[in-house]
Amino acid sequence: FEGSEDADRSAQLCIKAAGEAMKDAGLDDFAGDPKASVIIGSCVGGAVSISDYYEHGKKASDVTKMPISSIAPQVAGQCHAGGVVTNIANACAAGTISIAYACELIRAGKADVVLAGGSDTFAAVPYAGFLSLHALDADGCSPFNRCTGITLGEGSGVVVVESYEHAKARNAKMYCEVLGAGVSSDAHHITAPRPDGEGQMEAINRAIKNSGLKKSDIGYVNAHGTGTAKNDDAEFLSLHTIFDGENDNLSVSSTKAMTGHCLGAAGAIEAVFSIKALTTNTVVPTLGFKDEDMDKLAEKAGKIDFCPNKAHEKELTSVMNNSFAFGGNNASIIFSKEAGNVTVKEEKKPLVITGIGVVTPSGNSVDTYVANAVKNEALTEANLRSSVGKEDYDALGLKMSFYRKLDNFSQLQAVSGMEALKDADYAVTGDN
């Protein structure tokens, strides 16, 4: 692909990865094909352009490079994909969810081939954010071992997801089939995972159920494995709860010890690790263990092989890739050597809208908005901003301990979302 010099670094990396994926798949140019799509995940989008904007003169040209939404269209422009082009922003699960969404598009008959993946760069904005959270390990991350923090990385991973018939018709090589995926939410905390691992286990179990496999069929799991104490403890618990007694031949590793945490690109890059592990029958290692760490690992690992330091050969039929992100965004996906058809359409069901919530400069409820709209009063510069206050939170039962931690945009979303649920007469409880 040519002509990406003016793009943000995140888009440049993604364009490079997409070009490599298309070449590997034996694809050239989509020539506007309406069933060729691009789905790209990212955590921070054009972070380098954000830094450049504030550090080097606030150039207007930097603004259009900042949003996460700028990445997928630039990839689509390079390969002339004429189908669905969209971006996924579910933090560090974005890359995995992009691949899962690509499969759903194909199964629904909306696409034949999708470039799916993720991209993020090392930049001042994410570095400062993780530094302020005291989440960085000064010595390099050590997943499932020291668990004292993450190491930031950067990169992009893209895979070509294709319907079985479309790939077969053009005599394409097939690495594997995507059997199933699961996505869930912790609904717990903006950064910390649920300590009981319930959200993670929901995503894993959904992926296994959707794949039609038994737990014992999974030979290898590429874990989220960030190297933070809370994440690794929750992931240890999730893996043991699901697989202990069901799978005594499971291998698990975190490749973040080699790549660093590539944020929204992590799931896609780790999908590539997982697919290559599957196709080469090689379990990749978790690096960073010293001799004195082995006894402690043995206590935590039980019968699970966490692959310390060395790769090893293993006959693999199905593998799993897990991404458990900030905000409780959980995703799990299963790749398999088993042949199959991924174009089965889901049964069409009637869909209805049952609730509406709005936060606008003209009012923070549908009734108020409509009443002010009827007056036909033009908005002035003084009242162009939307705002929410204590009266909105109190009316919806939102506690200060929740909304005081949110930025303005998240506060607006929380109020409009809760208004919609209230309008739909849908009660939010700890169970749903």
Which residue ranges define each predicted feature?
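Short conserved active-site loop signatures built around small residues
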Residues: 95
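Short, high-confidence coil segments that cap the C-terminus of an alpha-helix
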Residues: 111-112, 316
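A short, small-residue-rich loop immediately preceding and capping a beta-strand
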Residues: 84-90, 112-118
